[in-house]
Amino acid sequence: MIKKENRSRLIIGSLIIFFGISIFISKYMYQYFLNKEDEEKIEQFFIKEEVKDQEIVEEIETTEEEIIIKNNYNYENYIAVLEIPKINLKRGIYDKSSNLNNVNKNITILKDSIMPSGDNASHIFLASHSGYGYTAFLKNINKLNVDDSIFFYYQNIKYIYKVSSIYEIEKTGSMSVSFTDGSDLTLITCIYGTNKQLVYVASLINQENY
């Protein structure tokens, strides 16, 4: 009887360990494939930014394999890419009207954002989670200081920003945005475990073609 009980416990224990390992591996693989998809989208953004509505422009050189990938995969392309070298962040940005432009899925561009266009002043507002989890893209933003660089790639132009101010605000469920005379980019994230948000404002200092 005791042997049977010990054997049952051993089997149950083994199953618990097995399922625990399986869940861990599944979560790891899921995040791995999400990261791979993001890398592919970013690469595609820089290679084929002029492609609109998933149409292949003849002037852009591409391989037969890339054409197959383009035609067979039905996913939305990024409209821009955010890069913060100091915290090793490089993420794509979806259109404001996209269902994927969701803070629980990606870095979100707020509807009040004014995208760069010619000599007009632009104001880009981006929000993301910090803390823990796959979507905590700004988890290391506290390492960012005044004068650190932020890059924003949009319509074949690399916009170069420098962090100009950092401050905290109360989390109220809504964001009051303010527009300056110059062009800027604002990052907003919640401070984990508090009822506050951290705001980074970066001023545009230069732009160049890429």
Regions found by a protein language model. Name each.
Residues 4-210:
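Solvent-exposed, non-transmembrane regions of membrane-associated and secreted proteins
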